């Protein structure tokens, strides 16, 4: 029986082929992670010229800092809202394509447009619409007696950054959900319809289980997106305010490292965030993926 393993004339060729990826991984991932871990154990002067080993003192100080703990729980809430809302809304719009006969191409194009917008631009767009004095949406809300001012109301500020972040990510999720739904054999849907199953029952009993692998992939991607890629949205929309109500871990790392020049604390926070993402990823692959059945 012939082996399917590719054979190379030179034993060095496989290493040469993977070398670019290994170099990129070392330079842009492993090296920065190692530097962050090293600085998290040091007391560094603001300009980084001198340092002193302090062990775990930075982490002890971190977990006794009420502002950091607030940012930690804000990150958990924000990431949960963005991930769950983004997946549910995108899946809903992807499922609607099945019932749109006229203008389906226009509808699909419209759903993909937000992905072409930069995160900071998306934040500015919704800031204009939710502007307390001149915003179209705030004017509409005022007609119903609702006063909107996200610069002073922490709940409204959180809603704004979650809404803008979800809107920016909808296109990405929609594309994968739509492709997954289109890959489901029509014969299964038609057989269920003949047996008397309605649209909702067909979706939950047939479509949803079959797109579980895609849903799991998007769950991981959206969680990473909520932790890291929403930084421009928060920076442009609220700058972490009001009163740190929208300050997530990634934004706090930036503010303390680049504005406050506290390199040791910023590095310690980076290590904690890295560890948190690793733990959540392991939990997802260990427990969530075990429920997924790949066809």
UniProtKB/Swiss-Prot annotation:
It comes from the Bacteria. Disulfide bonds: none annotated. Residues 76-284 form the ABC transmembrane type-1 domain. Keywords: Cell inner membrane, Cell membrane, Membrane, Transmembrane, Transmembrane helix, Transport. The keyword Phosphoprotein does not apply. GO terms for cellular component: plasma membrane. It is found in: Cell inner membrane. InterPro entries: MetI-like, MetI-like_sf, UgpAE/MalFG_permease. CDD domains: TM_PBP2 (cd06261). Residues 33-80, 131-156, 229-262 are periplasmic. Residues 1-11, 102-109, 178-207, 284-295 are cytoplasmic. The chain crosses the membrane at residues 12-32, 81-101, 110-130, 157-177, 208-228, 263-283. One of its GO terms (biological process) is transmembrane transport. Part of the ABC transporter complex UgpBAEC involved in sn-glycerol-3-phosphate (G3P) import. Probably responsible for the translocation of the substrate across the membrane. The complex is composed of two ATP-binding proteins (UgpC), two transmembrane proteins (UgpA and UgpE) and a solute-binding protein (UgpB). This is sn-glycerol-3-phosphate transport system permease protein UgpA. It comes from Escherichia coli O6:H1 (strain CFT073 / ATCC 700928 / UPEC). The gene is ugpA.
């Amino acid at each position: 029986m012939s082996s399917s393993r590719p054979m190379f004339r030179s034993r060095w060729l496989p290493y040469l082929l993977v070398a670019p990826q290994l170099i990129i991984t070392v330079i842009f991932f492993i090296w920065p992670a190692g530097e962050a871990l090293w600085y998290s154990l040091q007391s560094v002067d603001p300009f980084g010229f001198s340092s002193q080993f302090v062990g775990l003192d930075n982490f002890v100080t971190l977990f006794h800092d009420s502002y950091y703990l607030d940012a930690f729980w804000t990150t958990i809430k924000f990431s949960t809202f963005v991930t769950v809302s983004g997946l549910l809304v995108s899946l809903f719009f992807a499922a609607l394509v099945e019932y749109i006969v006229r203008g389906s191409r226009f509808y699909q194009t419209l759903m993909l447009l937000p992905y072409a917008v930069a995160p900071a631009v998306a934040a500015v767009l919704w800031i204009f619409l939710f502007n307390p004095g001149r915003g179209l949406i705030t004017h509409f809300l005022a007609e119903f007696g609702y006063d909107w001012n996200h610069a002073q109301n922490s709940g409204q500020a959180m809603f704004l950054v979650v809404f803008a972040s979800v809107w920016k990510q909808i296109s990405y999720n929609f594309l994968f959900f739509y492709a997954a739904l289109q890959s489901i054999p029509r014969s299964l849907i038609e057989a269920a319809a003949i047996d008397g199953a309605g649209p909702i029952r067909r979706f939950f009993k047939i479509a949803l289980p079959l797109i579980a692998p895609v849903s799991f992939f998007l769950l991981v991607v959206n969680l990473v997106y909520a932790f890291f890629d929403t930084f421009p949205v928060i920076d442009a929309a609220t700058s972490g305010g009001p009163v740190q109500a929208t300050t997530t871990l990634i934004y706090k790392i930036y503010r303390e490292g680049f504005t406050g020049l506290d390199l040791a604390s910023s590095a310690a926070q980076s290590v904690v965030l890295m560890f948190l993402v690793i733990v959540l990823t392991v939990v997802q692959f260990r427990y969530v993926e075990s429920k997924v059945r790949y066809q």
